[in-house]
Amino acid sequence: MPKLGMQSIRRRQLIDATLEAINEVGMHDATIAQIARRAGVSTGIISHYFRDKNGLLEATMRDITSQLRDAVLNRLHALPQGSAEQRLQAIVGGNFDETQVSSAAMKAWLAFWASSMHQPMLYRLQQVSSRRLLSNLVSEFRRELPREQAQEAGYGLAALIDGLWLRAALSGKPLDKTRANSLTRHFITQHLPTD
């Protein structure tokens, strides 16, 4: 008889082991056996909880996107009366949260983006994540700008966030959060009306 609560513990172990494997050997070279060994479980446990490697990869990406959503929402909830500028910076901060810029998370995101072009479920996850970012940004810009300008500014800031993140991921160095925050703050203030 399974122990109560073991499913969530096992799932967490396997997702963490998947991130470690992707960080070390990449998504394509990470095998079920390697992941199971890292998690200290049998390969049958992976099949039991996730069907196969693709199911585990999907769960891992859902976990990372959930962490991203939580990082953004936690910052926004802390600013219920915040200005558009403050709330936009909160969204930026959530996207540059440690859960999103650790070496393992960055490599997983890169592999996820590449795989999403060929796997429909990963593509849907990628689209949801991308639309959520754009929607959040446009919504905040819309507080101060006409719809069309808010959409342009939101699209531009999303591209800047993704570009800064991608440059850091491909450099193999940690994201320079000070520089990233400075550049995004400059973009935001350029697009919002002055008092």
UniProtKB/Swiss-Prot annotation:
Swiss-Prot/TrEMBL keywords = DNA-binding, Repressor, Transcription, Transcription regulation
Q: Which InterPro entries match?
A: BetI_C, DNA-bd_HTH_TetR-type_CS, Homeodomain-like_sf, HTH-type_TetR-like_transc_reg, HTH_TetR, Tet_transcr_reg_TetR-rel_C_sf, Tscrpt_rep_BetI
Q: Which domain of life is it from?
A: Bacteria
Q: Where is the HTH tetR-type domain?
A: 8-68
Per the record, DNA-binding region residues lie at: 31-50
| Pathway(s) annotated for this protein in UniProt | Amine and polyamine biosynthesis; betaine biosynthesis via choline pathway [regulation]
The disruption phenotype is: In cells lacking this gene, expression of the bet promoters is stimulated by osmotic stress but not by choline.
Induction description:
Negatively autoregulated.
Please give one Gene Ontology molecular function term for this protein: DNA binding
Single Gene Ontology BP term? glycine betaine biosynthetic process from choline
More details: BetI is an unusual repressor because it remains bound to DNA during induction.
What is the annotated role of this protein in its UniProt record? Repressor involved in the biosynthesis of the osmoprotectant glycine betaine. It represses transcription of the choline transporter BetT and the genes of BetAB involved in the synthesis of glycine betaine.
The record's listing under NCBIfam families reads: betaine_BetI, PRK00767.1
Query: What is the official name of this protein in its record?
Result: HTH-type transcriptional regulator BetI
What is the native source organism of this protein? Escherichia coli (strain K12)
Print the organism lineage. Bacteria, Pseudomonadati, Pseudomonadota, Gammaproteobacteria, Enterobacterales
Please name the gene that encodes this protein: betI
